[in-house]
Amino acid sequence: MAYKLLVVDDDKEIVETLKTRLIKEGYEVTVAYDGEEALLKVQKDNPDVILLDLMMPKLNGFEVLKHIRENFKDKWRPIIIVSASGELDAVKKSYSMEADHYLSKPVTMENILRGIRTMISLIPARKEA
């Protein structure tokens, strides 16, 4: 069974590039283009891993992260922040809000895939805890 990923970014080109490559890698991919849509997809599709941009319309990535951690406690799902904001404050805030990994754009596909594989490798350990 393929792992389910949710890619959340308001840049349609980035989303489509990621989706195409991740599907080729064998993942099941759902996409969202803003924070509100992301929360609906988390509830509907129950993804295993979320790739989340910070700067988006409607709800930003921090708001989405907070909502997921407060309201979807039934399942631990790794959240990887993929953001153009490489500022130390954004990185610190992400980790303090329980993001699991942070990648600064521009980021290579190899680094994204490595981050996803690392987070997936932790899922069984988290389920046992």
For each of these PLM feature ranges, what is it?
Residues 107-117:
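C-terminal output helix
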Residues 16-24:
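Charged docking surfaces used in two-component/phosphorelay signaling
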Residues 26-33, 41:
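Short hydrophobic/Thr-rich beta-strand motif most characteristic of the beta2 strand and flanking loop
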Residues 56:
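Receiver (REC) domain active-site loop signature in two-component systems and cognate sites
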Residues 45-51:
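Active-site beta3 strand of CheY-like receiver
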